[in-house]
Amino acid sequence: MKIDNTIAAVVTGGASGLGRASAQALAAAGVKVAIFDISEEAGEALASEIGGIFCNVDIMSEESCEAGFAKARAAHGQERVVVHCAVVASGGKTVGFDKSTGDYKRAPTAGIETAALGIFVASYRVASIAALGMANAATLNDDDERGCIILTSSAASQDGQIGQVAYGGGKGAVNSMVLPMARDLMDLGIRVNAILPGTFATPPMLGVKEHAPAVFAGLEASVPFPKRLGKPEEFGSLVMELVRNAYFNGQLIRLDGAIRMPPK
């Protein structure tokens, strides 16, 4: 897909971290970007910075997502690129010892349900709403391409650590969705891929650096090469290549400095 100012994009979770870097990279290439997030102040500030628009969208709500896409399309036209970075999840060991009660307890099923809704279902919701809009749009090139959907999974989907049954399982479900969705949409000229980031210098991880520098140093040392956390702009760079290169379809791409996560 040719990337220029004729293209519109939606980036969920776009107010911070990997979503922010994706929005910045797309906007720098002239793309009209709509930022979906619940962090209104940060989202509005970034939209002003990159010349995009902000839509206060809760990915857990069908109505909120539908309204966000409607607002984005009214401003920029049909989106041809969707980068889904937003996530709602929880953690906890399947069964662990509770010091407060002196007994074992299991992670509540509600946490698994939250992850299923906030990761897998939300990814489907965003992707399917976008695909429905793209299906009615004109083709963009000789490949008859209509759009590109990029989902965000995680290295935890393949190397889930202790306490990541809900998160790793949810991201694993996203992985399993990519190829069948790409096949569902192939006749419409819509591509679907997922990025599996490792440990990146996003706001939560930078918080670890501030409050537990030794732990942060250990995280950096655990990456084979380069021995540091990933830079959000490196994620944004891969997003741009996935948009640009039409032969990327139905793929899970790890972006992790060759790390394989240990149990904890």
PLM segments and residue spans:
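Catalytic loop of short-chain dehydrogenase/reductase
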Residues: S100-G118, S123-V126, L140-A173, V178-D187, ...
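Catalytic Tyr-x(3-8)-Lys segment
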Residues: I112, A212-E233
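Short, flexible catalytic-loop segment of classical short-chain dehydrogenase/reductase
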Residues: L196-G207
